[in-house]
From Swiss-Prot:
GO terms for cellular component: cytosol; nucleus; Smc5-Smc6 complex. GO terms for biological process: DNA damage response; double-strand break repair; double-strand break repair via homologous recombination. This is Non-structural maintenance of chromosome element 5. The keyword Cell membrane does not apply. Component of the smc5/smc6 complex which consists of two subcomplexes, smc5-smc6-nse2 and nse1-nse2-nse4. Interacts with nse6 and rfp1. Keywords: Chromosome, Cytoplasm, DNA damage, DNA recombination, DNA repair, Nucleus. Acts in a DNA repair pathway for removal of UV-induced DNA damage that is distinct from classical nucleotide excision repair and in repair of ionizing radiation damage. Functions in homologous recombination repair of DNA double strand breaks and in recovery of stalled replication forks. May prevent formation of excessive Holliday junctions or assist in their resolution. It is found in: Cytoplasm; Nucleus; Chromosome. It holds the Pfam family Nse5. It comes from Schizosaccharomyces pombe (strain 972 / ATCC 24843).
């Protein structure tokens, strides 16, 4: 973008005509192929969530439209705009650095990183809805980063030598639990009067909890996609293997409802497939060889055949949920070599083992196993080529 256009945009900002500056950006996105400099993308991100800008104004609507257009037109994505590193190129810098929206008001000049933002959201603040609207867009940026940019942006968030990995896992898991107190706003230190901490209220709705859980699960999947793995198996003593062990540790501390929420939000992801294997193998003490490719599911199922349950009662419940998750993954597969008879036998054996075990709070997983059995039984009788 040439300096004349920057001057027009920043003159509007300086004269308190923010809507006019956004109109210029909207026009450029609609009619030209000119990439939007990172400083103006950061301005839109900031305006969406900054407490000093009301949610009901046209400013938020314009910023949301601009960011959505950037996502839809992938060629216009400037990943540097979403990084918390401030070494931008001259073209990505504003013409006038002194303007508040580029300096002390800007989200990217605050003393926070990406995981601090997720931690703030997981504390269910009163402005959670604003942050969720932004994070829906941000999540799409990270998904495109994984697909087309080699997860370079996520790697920046994880820090050198993955120093942020444990904090990222802890914060993502906080999206599945209810906090007692709202954290300070990411803008607290730069505002003239920092908002006081308050008890969480009004943001613990079912919708808010579901959206946060979905966010936490998707971020974990994006971290998993970033981590190097072996050709077919997750190699021991690697970051990927360490990641699964930390997830298992955190997952075991969730209550039954939270565990169901966690696995449910992982969907049909590769992370769910691999984590299920880790939990199963650890539970019965066999060598942990996690196959992250699904092309030979029958071989992996043979290795995991249920001959015993973990001795620990808590691990028994985790074990059952992991089986439900692992077998559920198989129902989505279209592998020609899929052995339905082995699957049916495994499922029946597992169901029988748990029927004979006295465990409290496993009704839902048992019901899912029963539904699978019925489905498989019908499939066998009708001789269908595919289970589903």
């Amino acid at each position: 973008m040439n300096s004349a256009l920057k001057a027009i945009i920043e003159l509007c900002i300086e004269e308190d005509l923010l809507p006019k500056s956004l109109d210029v950006l909207e026009y450029l996105l609609s009619t030209t192929s000119i990439p939007i400099p990172a400083c103006y993308i950061r301005m839109c991100i900031t305006l969406l969530v900054h407490p000093e800008y009301p949610t009901s104004s046209n400013i938020q609507e314009s910023c949301n439209w601009i960011l959505q257009q950037v996502v839809e037109n992938r060629s216009k994505i400037n990943f540097d705009a979403w990084s918390f590193e401030n070494d931008l190129s001259d073209n990505d810098m504003p013409k006038e650095n002194y303007l508040k929206i580029f300096s002390n008001q800007c989200l990217f000049t605050q003393d926070v990183d990406y995981w601090d933002l997720i931690a703030y959201m997981s504390s269910r603040p009163p402005d959670l809805e604003r942050w969720m609207s932004l994070m829906d867009i941000w999540l799409r940026i990270l998904e495109i980063d994984a697909e087309e940019n080699g997860s370079a942006l996520m790697k920046k968030y994880m820090g050198e030598d993955l120093c942020e990995l444990q904090d990222a896992i802890r914060i993502c898991f906080s999206c599945f639990t209810l906090p007692q107190q709202t954290m300070e706003s990411p803008f607290a230190t730069s505002m003239s009067k920092a908002p006081a901490k308050t008890e969480s209220r009004g943001s613990n709705s079912f919708e808010g909890t579901s959206r946060l859980a979905n966010l936490g699960a998707k971020l974990l999947c994006l971290i998993w996609a970033m981590l190097p793995k072996g050709r077919f198996f997750v190699v021991h003593l690697t970051d990927a293997f360490h990641f699964l062990s930390k997830l298992d540790e955190r997952f075991s501390k969730l209550n039954a409802k939270q565990q169901d929420l966690f696995f449910g939000n992982l969907g049909a992801s590769n992370l769910r497939y691999c984590l299920s294997q880790y939990i199963l193998m650890k539970g019965i003490g066999i060598g942990i060889n996690i196959r992250h490719t699904r092309c030979e599911f029958t071989k992996q199922l043979t290795q995991l055949l249920p001959t015993s349950l973990p001795k620990n009662k808590i691990r028994q419940k985790l074990h059952l949920r992991a089986w439900v998750s692992f077998l559920g993954s198989a129902l989505r597969e279209s592998d020609r070599n899929f052995d339905k008879e082995l699957f049916y036998t495994t499922l029946k054996q597992l169901y029988t083992m748990y029927q004979q075990t006295e465990l409290v709070g496993i009704d839902r997983p048992m019901a899912i196993l029963k539904d699978m059995l019925v489905l498989l039984d019908i499939s066998k009788k009708l001789s269908l080529d595919k289970i589903v």
